[in-house]
UniProtKB/Swiss-Prot annotation:
Membrane topology, record value: Multi-pass membrane protein
First-listed, main subcellular location of the protein, grouped into a coarse class: membrane
Primary gene name: ykjA
Protein keywords: Cell membrane, Membrane, Transmembrane, Transmembrane helix
Family: Belongs to the UPF0702 family.
Domain of life: Bacteria
One of the record's GO cellular component terms: plasma membrane
Classification via InterPro entries: DUF421, UPF0702_alpha/beta_dom_sf, YetF_N
UniProt xrefs under Gene3D superfamilies: bsu07140 like domains
UniProt name for this protein: UPF0702 transmembrane protein YkjA
Pfam families linked to this entry: DUF421 (PF04239), YetF_N (PF20730)
UniProt entry tagged with the keyword Transmembrane helix: yes
Phenotype of the disrupted gene, per the record: Non-essential, it can be disrupted.
Localization in the cell: Cell membrane
Length: 243
């Protein structure tokens, strides 16, 4: 009887752990980036691995899920070869070419003109005439290449040199110091505390800092969870009765 209780309690944990391991082995992709093989694997493993929760066929389910994973990895490997890719992966479909909507492409992908216009608006374009090329990728995502006169102005168009992008490095997150980032910068906590004191913040108030980052100049920017916003500012208005 005790054994039955343990099986009942541990089976969901085992099933979840196995499913997690299988999906980690399959690789990481967002749902929007999945092709047909990725979706097939997701549904198949989800269905197969959930069966042991209702039945006692855990070993058989693990075997079938593992077999699906092996087949998926083989097919994914083959899809990297130009010889097999045309057979295994759906080719992109042209939806707009030189500002003209391709009706055959829309019919093939079962898209309406309204849906296509919505996809363009998501990319920041309202008029198909501004589009040089729009294609639907194998993942279902629509890629848009605007005409030269419709694209956003680039720095090189102004004969200017752009500074290299710098991603602010988080040093404090939710009141906790990220020591691994300090180590990466060859800094220590004493240096960070000095920077905080320069800004008028005591290390004792560390818990009130939601985010602290270092920019390219070495300056520290802080975002506190105690907002100190001016009242009755029209720019801070929000709909509702909580103003």
């Amino acid at each position: 009887m005790l054994w039955m209780v343990w099986v009942f309690l541990l089976k969901p944990v085992i099933v979840f752990s196995i499913a997690y391991i299988l999906f980690r082995l399959a690789g990481k992709k967002a749902v929007s980036q999945m092709n047909n093989f990725d979706l097939l694997l997701t549904f198949a493993i989800g269905t197969i691995i959930s069966e042991p929760i209702l039945t006692s066929k855990l070993p058989m389910s693990i075997y079938y899920a593992g077999a699906f994973l092996v087949l998926y990895l083989i097919m994914s490997k083959l899809s990297l070869s130009n010889k097999w890719r045309w057979l295994l992966v759906v080719s992109p479909t042209v939806l707009i070419r030189n500002g003209d909507i391709d009706e055959r492409g829309l019919r093939k992908e079962r898209l309406t003109v309204n849906e296509l216009l919505g996809k363009l608006r998501e990319k920041g374009y309202a008029d198909p005439a501004d589009i040089d090329l729009a294609i639907i990728e194998e993942t279902g995502e629509v890629s848009v290449i605007p005409k030269e006169e419709a694209r956003a102005v680039q720095v090189r168009d102004l004969n200017m040199e752009a500074e290299r992008n710098f991603i602010p490095i988080p040093l404090i997150l939710d009141g906790e110091i990220l020591d691994h980032n300090l180590k990466y910068l060859q800094k220590n906590r004493s240096w960070l505390f000095e920077k905080l004191e320069e800004k008028g913040y005591s290390p004792k108030l560390l818990s009130s800092i939601i985010l602290g980052t270092m920019n390219a100049r070495g300056d520290i920017s802080l975002d506190l969870n105690t907002a100190n916003e001016p009242q009755h500012d029209p720019y801070l208005y929000k709909p509702g009765n909580n103003n």
